[in-house]
């Protein structure tokens, strides 16, 4: 099951980064905890967690936010998070 969110930006040109991470978020309750934190970040446009994937993949589309910030958000919530090599 995938859980995610989508934000709408004003009409402007932005460089959107696609960031992909391995996590240990395995159930809906954990995903909802992380959802509150990711949704609170204005620079995160869209995200989803594929809990059926063996790596529990978190994909984030964002502007002006990097890998370290996303990892920090997930780790501060108490979960494992590392960038997957692309």
What are these regions (language model features)?
Residues 23-25, 59-64:
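Short beta-strand-to-loop capping motifs
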Residues 2-7, 39-46:
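Short amphipathic beta-strand starts and helix->beta connectors
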Residues 19, 24, 32, 72, ...:
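N-terminal targeting leaders
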Residues 18, 55-57:
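A generic structural signal for beta-strand entry/edge sites
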Residues 48-54:
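RNA-recognition motif
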Residues 63-86:
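C-terminal structural segments of small proteins and small subunits
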Residues 9-26:
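Short glycine-/aliphatic-rich beta-strand segments at the starts of folded cytosolic domains
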């Amino acid at each position: 099951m995938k859980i995610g969110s989508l934000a709408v930006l004003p009409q402007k040109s932005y460089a959107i980064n696609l960031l992909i991470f391995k996590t240990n978020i395995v159930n809906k309750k954990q995903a909802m905890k992380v959802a509150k934190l990711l949704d609170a970040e204005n620079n995160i446009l869209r995200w989803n967690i594929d809990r059926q994937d063996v790596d529990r993949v978190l994909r984030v589309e964002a502007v002006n936010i990097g890998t370290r910030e996303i990892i920090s958000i997930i780790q501060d919530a108490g979960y494992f998070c590392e960038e997957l090599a692309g």
